[in-house]
Amino acid sequence: MKWAMIATWRMAIDGITEGSQLLKEGKRAGEAVETAIKMVEDYPFYKSVGYGGLPNENCEVELDAAYMDGDTLSIGAIGGIRDFKNPISIAKKLSEERFNCFLVGTGAEDYARKNGFERVNMLTDRAKQYYEKRKRETIEKGLSPYAGHDTVGMIALDCNKKMVAGTSTSGLFMKRRGRVGDSPVSGSGFYVDSEVGGASATGLGEDLMKGCISYEIVRLMREGYHPQEAADKAVSDLNDKLTKRRGKSGDLSVVCLNNKGKFGVATNIEGFTFSVITEEQKPTVYLCENENGKTTYEPASEEWLEAYLKRIKSPITFD
């Protein structure tokens, strides 16, 4: 197989469809990943990534992103950046640096400003409304504020056998100021090696980091595991370890792709979705189920896809 792209969640389908056009034209995986993730970041109804992303406890949007080149193993990452558009592009630029390639907070913002990245207020009116609703529910109904942590994570393989991984997220909803999860952390939120393959994770970053899960999947693929076997084993093993040692495990979901274009996916939750497109397969959204440590999936129906769009665009109401 010449090229392929896989990403976490339904929200990535339009992005990987656009990115695949570049791969068809012989463009590089990095360009495809950046283009695809920027589309997710720019869509205001995706409330866990980029513009319109859900804010922290102080109603500030802090964004994390990362980019990794599977040929050189170069990494660029940012954490807790505010008021800059398209953090994936900032991370990609940072991957060109020999030193200082992971910047956070004001340091990341200074770097973005000096390198001409667009400054934008990333907090939308809709996100503020959602914040106020959840704040009220937290106080009045005792609901957990930490709901909403859906990272877009992506891996691409191009016609030159180069592989790239990218991530972008606004992180845990109503998180403490300065909190950073797994998404920009190499080996946890992402990892890619063009000689083997790549993986990316989404879910509760605090738990995903406890298993360095993306690196573990790539390691298993290097040992000869099929991507699906590697994904299932990594998620099942970490879920079991956390349950045994801590009494419970947070949400753990992963996607992976090897350097031959074969993909895998695994989750320990209900409702995980992913998006994939290859030279041989049209862009498809899949719905996942997990039973006894094995993940299965089937294409989303047109009815499900229509209901999804209706749900994410529905007005925010206060009881």
Model-identified regions with their sequence ranges:
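Alpha/propeptide regions of enzymes that mature by internal proteolysis
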Residues: 1-319
